[in-house]
Every structure is written in C-alpha cells, then in structure tokens.
C-alpha cells in the first residue's frame, strides 16, 4: 500500500518513517510498527513531523478558507495545522504520525477529521491547538464501466456528486443539501429522497442492525485507513464486521478514503418548495400523520414539513419540501400536502443537483441542531407545536434569530428497505412501526446569546420527551448527524449494537486512537 513511498524518509537527520508494512492483514498494532517511535518523539510535535513528511499538504492558520465550517462555533476553534492529503497513502502517513505523536505528546497531537464541516457544534470536525485532517482533496466521483456503482471520495459535497451523476441519468442515495459533506453523512446514517425505495445511505447484510431511509444502506465497500496506518477494504466478504460498523458508527474506526456506492437509473423528478402561512398548521399535521402511517405508502414520495417562527412579526409559516422521484407532476400520494393554500410554490420537474441547491443556509453564523424520534401520532404532532409556541417568546431578543423545526416521515417501509439492502448499526427495526424525526435548526448572530438559545432549546426537547412518554410514543433512536453535542446517539442504537461497535473498535483500533486522540464526534465508550 506504500508503493509510492521510499522505504524510509530522512527528516532533519532523523529516520522518521520506516515504511515496512506486513503483507498479511492483522490488527494488532504491535505487528504494524511502520514508524520509528524515538524519531517521532524527538521531532517535538505532530505539526512539525507532518510538515516535514507531507510538506505542501500541511497548512497553518491564517491561510485557511473562511467557509471551511458551516457554523461559527466550529470556525472559532484554532487548530495548530491542517493536513489536506491528496490520496489514501498520505492519509495513512498522517495517521501513523498522529498515532505515535499521541503517545509522546498527546496535548499537541489531538486531531479531528473534516469532510464537509457541516456538523455545527464546536469540536465535531475541528480541534483547538491540534491537527485537522481535511479530506477535501479526496474528491473523486468515478462511475464504474457498467454504471452500477460509483466510487465517491469523502471530500466531496453532495452537490459535486450530483453534478457528475445527473448528466448520466444516475443517482445514489445521497444527501439532500448540496453543501453537506459525503463522509460524515454516510458514516452517520443519512436521509435521502430515495430512501423509501433503497434504504439508508449505507446498509449491510446483517439483520441485527438496520439503517432504514439513510445514506448508509447502499455502500458496497468502504476503503479505510485504520489507526495503524494500514489501508483495508470493508465489505460483505472482507472485514464484514467493520463494514457493518461503519454504517452508522461515524468516525470511531478509521478514516474512510473512498465509498463504493450502488448507483441506479434516475430520470428527472418532481420536487421543490411550498410556503404557506401558519393558519394551515393543523391541516398539514393531519396530512403528515396520514402520509407517514399509510399502509400503502408510495415509496417514490417524501416530504419534509418545516415549522418556521418569524421573530420580527411573531408569526409562523410552514415550508414543505415534497419530492416524488418519478417524472410525474402532482402525484396522489402528496395531494393532501400540495393542496394546502400557499404563497410560494417552486414545484417543478428537475434533478438532484438543482433541488439540492434550493435550500441554502450560508456559513458564518451561530448554529444549533437537536433531534429526536417518535412514533407517529396526531396528538404528539400537536403537542410538539404547543410546546414550541411556549418556548419561542423567551428567545425574541436573541440577535438575528432564525428558527425552524422540521418534521420528517420515517415510516416502517424505510426500515424494510434497509433490511432488503442489508442492515447497519443504527438499531432501527420495522417492528418500531411508523416513526417521524424532529429536527430543530436555529441560527443566531451574537455569542452572548449562546446560553439562552441552547438552554431554551434543550429544555424544549426535554418537554417533547416527557410528552412522548405520557402518550406512549417514545423511540430511543437519535439520528447522529442531527444530534447536539450533549445528546447520545450511540446509546440510542441499543445495548447490543453499541456492544458490537465497541468490539469492532477494540479489534481494529486496539490502542483507541480514534477514541482518545480524536475527541470530536460521538464516542463509543462514554
């Protein structure tokens, strides 16, 4: 795997890297030993070692782009350096240096891994005084000769992927926003317009763990750099436990350098946005409940219902994002939604590239996301909005506040699609029945408002949970890619799945590099 590198690299008089890698796959780090530990210790810090080995692939603060991170909380952190590897071998070299450096000077070798930088909470994909491994140069989108799979690099954003696939009449179960990164969405699950048909963005052949309607369900192979620096493939035939774990297990096992995703033929389809005033809220709740729990759910249909508060006028509007992944206008499955009077309607026949750019939230503001999952219930839908109405008055003076609560159907058909595709590590099962996801996305300007916005929003979700318990509609699943820093999505996968993920971590990362030295994300042993 290191055929492009010399057997050793001379670093300022130090033989830093002795790249002799065993030919057999073994995950005992003692058998890897590709790096001279004493040499790394003498260099003094990881950024120096990385700069000497990877040279122009290492950058320092002051020359980094302003839009590296979506949220201001992430952008406010100051890494000591940023590594932008151009291929899997450079990722491997970086990880080997970070692995040894974390033993000798852990205070200077913590690291974070960045794909698109869309997770908003501080430290998710950035690190103070540490190293960011930025995957933006791993941006290949390569369609197989027979057009059944696509090799996608983690440094892509979904808009980049669709720009390649749409002209070929192809699609993958990818993200719905152009600016979201591929790597985090796939390894964390991933909702898609195509999920009712194909499952989540990443599923496996093991029924014990299932994705549902996420991006994780359709990944045939993960190319992964392990903590040892070894590069392996994880699929149904090789390292199948790692394959399953990566379908929802996030950044806990290694750095994925390529996803082989199943592709399928896809024509242009119907989608867009519909904005209505808040007087139609209850009618939309009835439509949402009926749609999500329909025994004849149309797998081509999806919709997201956003409840948006406008602080300046203390008024409400709704924003719908329906899609029907056939070239058909006004399908019956979505009629109860689309018949609601509106003052903005952009519904049209177009493609994923176009639709993914429609709803855009600019970087550079303070952001918060919180999520929960409940069994579908008209009483719960109404309770959510009632609690929301009681919460927002306290936030009226937060500067530049934007508030949106999204409701997303998660019918049992999606878990069934995941089961057909294989499974994953999310713990969802069609026996859970018809569910729906709740996502709060709120944006504001001034850091002084952080405690107010965060405390009120967190309290609101605690009230949601209490009401769900009263109504008997709870579900433990917390979608990792939407979760706030204080939530525990791994626990929501269930004890069996969490134990499985921990076992996989011990096998492929026995030192615990991705648990100890990479503090961002949701860890397995908390």
Describe the role of every protein-language-model region.
Residues 2-5, 13-526:
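Soluble FAD-dependent oxygen oxidases
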């Amino acid at each position: 795997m290191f055929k492009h590198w010399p057997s050793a690299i001379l670093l300022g008089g130090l033989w830093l890297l002795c790249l002799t890698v065993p030919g057999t796959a073994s995950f005992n780090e003692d058998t890897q030993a590709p790096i001279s530990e004493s040499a790394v210790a003498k260099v003094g810090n990881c950024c120096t070692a990385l700069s000497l080995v990877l040279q122009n692939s290492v950058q320092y603060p002051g020359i980094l782009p302003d839009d590296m991170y979506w949220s201001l909380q992430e952008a406010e952190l100051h890494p000591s350096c940023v590594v932008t590897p151009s291929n899997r071998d450079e990722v491997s070299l970086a990880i080997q240096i970070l692995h040894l450096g974390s033993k000798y000077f852990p205070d200077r070798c913590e690291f974070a891994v960045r794909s698109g930088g869309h997770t908003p909470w501080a430290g998710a994909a950035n690190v103070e005084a540490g190293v960011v491994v930025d995957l933006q140069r791993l941006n290949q989108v390569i369609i197989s000769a027979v057009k059944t799979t696509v090799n996608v690099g983690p440094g892509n954003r979904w808009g980049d992927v669709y720009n390649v696939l749409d002209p070929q009449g192809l699609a993958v179960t990818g993200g719905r926003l152009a600016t979201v990164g591929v790597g985090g969405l796939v390894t964390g699950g991933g909702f898609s317009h195509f999920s009712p048909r194909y499952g989540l963005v990443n599923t496996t052949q093991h029924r014990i763990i299932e994705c549902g309607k996420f991006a994780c369900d359709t990944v045939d192979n993960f190319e992964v750099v392990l903590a040892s620096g070894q590069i392996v493939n994880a699929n149904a035939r090789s390292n199948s436990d790692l394959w399953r774990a990566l379908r929802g297990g996030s950044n806990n096992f290694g750095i994925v350098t390529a996803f082989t995703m199943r592709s399928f033929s896809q024509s242009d389809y119907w989608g867009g946005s519909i904005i209505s005033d808040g007087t139609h809220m209850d009618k939309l709740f009835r439509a949402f409940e009926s749609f999500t729990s329909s025994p004849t759910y149309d797998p081509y249909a999806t919709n997201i219902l956003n409840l948006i508060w406008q602080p300046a006028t203390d008024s409400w509007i709704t924003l719908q994002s329906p899609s029907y992944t056939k070239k058909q206008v006004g399908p019956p499955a979505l009629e109860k939604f689309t018949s609601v009077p509106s003052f903005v309607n952009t519904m049209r026949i177009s493609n994923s590239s176009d639709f993914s750019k429609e709803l855009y939230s600019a970087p550079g503001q303070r952001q918060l996301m919180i999520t929960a999952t409940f069994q579908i219930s008209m009483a719960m839908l109404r309770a959510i909005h009632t609690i929301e109405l009681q919460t927002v008055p306290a936030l009226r003076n937060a500067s530049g506040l934007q508030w949106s609560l999204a409701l997303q159907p998660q019918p049992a058909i999606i878990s069934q699609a995941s089961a057909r595709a294989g499974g994953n590590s999310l713990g969802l099962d069609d026996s859970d029945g018809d569910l729906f996801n709740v996502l709060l996305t709120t944006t504001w300007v001034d850091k002084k408002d952080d405690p107010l916005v965060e405390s009120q929003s967190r309290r609101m979700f605690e009230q949601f949970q209490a009401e769900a318990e009263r109504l008997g509609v709870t579900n433990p699943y917390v979608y990792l890619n939407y979760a706030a820093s204080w939530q525990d999505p791994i626990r929501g996968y269930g004890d069996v799945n969490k134990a499985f993920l921990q076992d996989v971590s011990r096998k492929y990362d026995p030192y615990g590099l991705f648990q100890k030295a990479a503090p961002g994300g949701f860890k397995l042993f908390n």
